[in-house]
């Protein structure tokens, strides 16, 4: 995918049931939470591990003084994704000097819409990554937000996630590269980081399922570094049964690593 033209890809077997179950177990384990009540919020992103998708992604090439980072992830769920069911993906890409944006619209064999994924990647100056300092948010600034317990992600869990997701970016696995960039350890993948929103969301609003998620990634979190998830409930979306929420991933220094706006439905 090198331009804005759509490309249709049949995905026999769709979302792999084994990978989906393994991701659910991994998220609950790292979050120190009960088993997930529903399909992992980020399960549709596991389709990036599909060989047919990998062959067509045409990822941006980072120069020697650049690193490829994820800026944004959006997911819109139109109906439940059933692991193992055949899917068709209509994909498009927009490439520019600073990175790339991808859109995947997922449908069943009959053409019924199931989900849409939007991803934005950016080529970032490698020497600047360790110096990124996003805003601080102290707990008292978030009012009556629900807070997770402290979470840290060991490299072994990152490696498991990389195997499930097909993410081959060395920033997540290469300790030497991380050290050369001034980082304490490889970086936790952004999608894995925001997966930790689901356990606290299900605890606050049991029996709900994801309708949409829009996440922005602001700073790297290294393996074994502590963070917490803060979840704010923001009422109902007009004309729907959707609950609006905002989630923050916040490091031990109170700096915001990622922000996600969600809607969940009963």
Question: Whereabouts are the PLM-identified features?
Answer:
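Hot-dog-fold acyl-thioester-processing enzymes
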Residues: 2-70, 129-207
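HotDog/MaoC-like acyl-thioester-processing domains
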Residues: 2-8, 72-150, 220-266
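Short, surface-exposed, charged/polar-biased interaction segments
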Residues: 179-182, 218, 222
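Long, charged, glycine-rich C-terminal linkers/tails
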Residues: 211-215
